[in-house]
Amino acid sequence: MDQNGASGSRPNRLSQGKEAYACERSATVSAAADRSNIINEMAKICEADRQTSAIARRTQVHERLAVANSDFVAVEDLILAYAEPTPEDQVEMIMRDFCSSPTYEEDEDEPSYESEPWFRFRNKRIRTYSRKRDPKSYMAVRTEKSSGTSGLSVQRDLNTSSTSVACDFDAASSQKIHEVLLNLSQYFSATAKASSPTPVPSQIDLPTEARQDSGDECFNAEVENLRDDLLQNGFTFEASIYDNEHEQEDSGKFNVCSDADSTPKKTDVEIAEHKKHLKGPTQAEHVGKEENTNFILEGIPLSEWLTPMEPPKISKDVIKNIPDKKVKLEPSSQKEQKSSKDSNESKIRAASCDITKKNEGTTVLDQPNAAQQENLSNDGDLLEEFLFNEWHPMQCSNGPSTSNDAIKVPKEEINSIKRNDEEQPEKETPNKSRSTSSHQLSFRKTFLKFIEISGEMKIKGEKFVEKVVSGLHHPSHKCNLRTEEYSDNHSQVMESTQRVEFKSALSKPIELLDEKETYDMLAKVEVGEINGKCSPLNNETIAEPEFCGFRTASNKAIPISEKMKIKTAEFMAEFQSKETNHQNDYLVNQPNDNSTSVGRDTAFKKSIEISEEMPTKASKLVVVDTTLGEPHQPKIDPVCSDLNESQFFGFRTASNKAIEITEAMEKRGAMFLAQSRATDQQAEWQPSDFPDIPHTSPKNEIHSINVENTKAVHTKTASETEFFGFRTASNKGIVISENTKKKVAQFMSEFQAADASTDSNKPIVISEESRNIAAKFVDEAATEDSPNKPTFCNVQSQENPLDIEHFKHDLFVERSAKEEHPLCSQPLVRTPRRSQEIHSSLSQLAGQSPLDQATKKSVIARRNLLSLKRKRKIVSSTETSTSCASPAMERFAPKPSSTSTPLADRDLNRSKDCAKNRQDAEDMSPICMQPKKSRRLGLSRSRY
């Protein structure tokens, strides 16, 4: 059954596949037919378009043959006339704009793989203004890279330009540079053998001529520069420096001293002379090499050496030889000067420098020959050019020694030097005539600048040295010589006619009034200094006379001229007169029972103790008349009495000009003094605002004070209660008009208890008598300070004594009533009580404002408008009007000041002062008062 099922299913599958294939074939055929149909349709459309365009062209050609009789232009004509440019035209325009500059370069070769259109700047390159690179530099880098096979570890950056690129060398110079680098590499490889345990083998193929000591390459350039500097400064070379004539040891170590140390090239004559002194085959070989020496490093500065170099460490055992020749440096101007006599120090140094052998820690001096004697004389000449303090200890050896052992010199050599020195005669001081034959000692400002020394200076120097030497052994003789010399100088100064001059800081001569006194003073000062230095009593204290003058910070006495004494006398006289006036005032103000001591006080009112020496010192400077009768005319010192000028005692301006004092000024001064004393006493005895009469004087006695006037002003009695006027800050009287007098009279009448009327509504009637009294009182109080008007001391006039007494009696009655009834002592006429809705600041404005009446009324009207025209509630009753216990304040009582729009003094943090709980309008100003939200009828609105 399975086979039958399988056989039955197979044809079914084939039939299904055939059907599917037929469907797909039909679909492809239909799709191809559709495509062919679309192509045919498109071809038909294109053909139709072609035919229509051809027809249009034919018709257009026919129409153009006709004459245009209208301004009509077809669209096709516009399109043909204004056709867009092709991209090639645009590229040409851009090329003309951007590529016309000479710095523009274009590559002709174009890649073939690019297709049009390509970017128009594909092969375009615009050059900047930089340095043009040399095409040869690439070749130089390649050659360096290929030839750099040496053992030097020089790292180069191929991206940066090397030195060979920066400067073009020829073949010879580049070859020299390479040889130098190879020599340096050999030097470092040779020095590394001793330090490193495993030396690296050298792979450098060096030329035969380059195998020389390392000192030639290390020091040649430095020596050349030193030679040029010395030749420019005027120095010459007579011999070469230490030559490199030592043997090279088997250990491979090198010495620092070499042939390169010699500054100039050796001539043939020098080489021939040098060969005579050589001993050994190695030295001859070095001389032969020296002739063919090539200065490889000549012309290359040290700054271009990239590798730092350090000389190798050399032990003292290797160096055993020292050259015979020495070098001598001296200025060319003194080249021919030679001396046959040397000093002891120069011989010792020359002997110590001639050490040639060192055996078992001791040194032996060679026997001096002719060449060494010549060297000794040359060294003596060289050492004479330097000062003694510029000499430095030196040790001459075959090379740089690190030991600090002293060099032993045999005693026989030193004794022979001393004997030769004793046999030689003493040196004489060189003069200008002998300057050509011997070296002269000189002083130098800098290394090459010398100070010229004249013959007089040399003679003075010799005398000074002799005095110093003699003074070291005989100090008493030295002191006597100095005293004799100073006395001779003093006699020469007194006898000579030469003028002694003093110069200021700007080198200007100062004129001397008395030249003789100046000579005497200088001689005394010099003799005093000599006596002070030479006297045996220097250690003992000598009592100097006490100086009672003034001294500077350096303890120099200040001379006091006659003008200074006169000014001091004037000042002391004025000071004494002021002091006596203050003492008199103090005595007047003090009670008679207590006795006061007159003296000087400090700023803290502490008495100054005056000793007995202080008056004597003061009397030596200034003599002051202490009499009180004429304090402005002091007695001047008799020294100043012979002056013809009249002395001025007064006031002066800032430019020291005298101020003339007129009679009016004197009167005003007297008035001011009397007023100040009266006010002081009034403030001390009765410190009340108004003049009071003491309770202990029932008869109204008037106390008076005697005032002294120094300028013919008679003393007058002034009472305590005289002055009632007004003055400015400069103590000038204020003129009071009639209107002001009436107001003052009205003001004063309010304080008088005329009638004991209890009716508060009854108007007050001011009598004519009280008005006259007040007016006269004000007239007298407001008088100006002029010589035509009487002074305030005479306020108690003789015309109206009864009026003044009556006024004082009224004041006394009023004050006695206040003391008996303190509660009823308020004035009867008061302002109405303040309303509970008006702030105190507005009441202050009404009472204390300096405005006139009209302005006050306008301000009050404005206040009423802002407060909604609330009327003031006058709370009054018979009890408050009749009784004296009214809590209201007086009209003119002092009140606290406030701002224009004050607020109530409240604390917002407290609950009772919060705005929610506050409902009274008196807590705020009427300007800032909140409106009351009450129910209103009709169309009325709130003003806020």
UniProtKB/Swiss-Prot annotation:
GO terms for cellular component: nucleus. BRCA2 repeats lie at residues 543-577, 644-678, 719-753. The keyword Zinc does not apply. Residues 932-944 have a biased composition (Basic residues). GO terms for biological process: cell division; DNA synthesis involved in double-strand break repair via homologous recombination; meiotic DNA repair synthesis involved in reciprocal meiotic recombination; meiotic recombination checkpoint signaling; regulation of DNA-templated transcription; response to camptothecin. Keywords: Cell cycle, Cell division, DNA damage, DNA repair, Meiosis, Mitosis, Nucleus, Repeat. Residues 325-348, 415-431, 904-921 have a biased composition (Basic and acidic residues). It is found in: Nucleus. The keyword DNA damage applies. Its main location: nucleus. Involved in and required for double-strand break repair by meiotic and mitotic homologous recombination. During meiosis, has a dual role in the repair of meiotic double-stranded breaks and the efficient activation of the meiotic recombination checkpoint. This is Breast cancer type 2 susceptibility protein homolog.
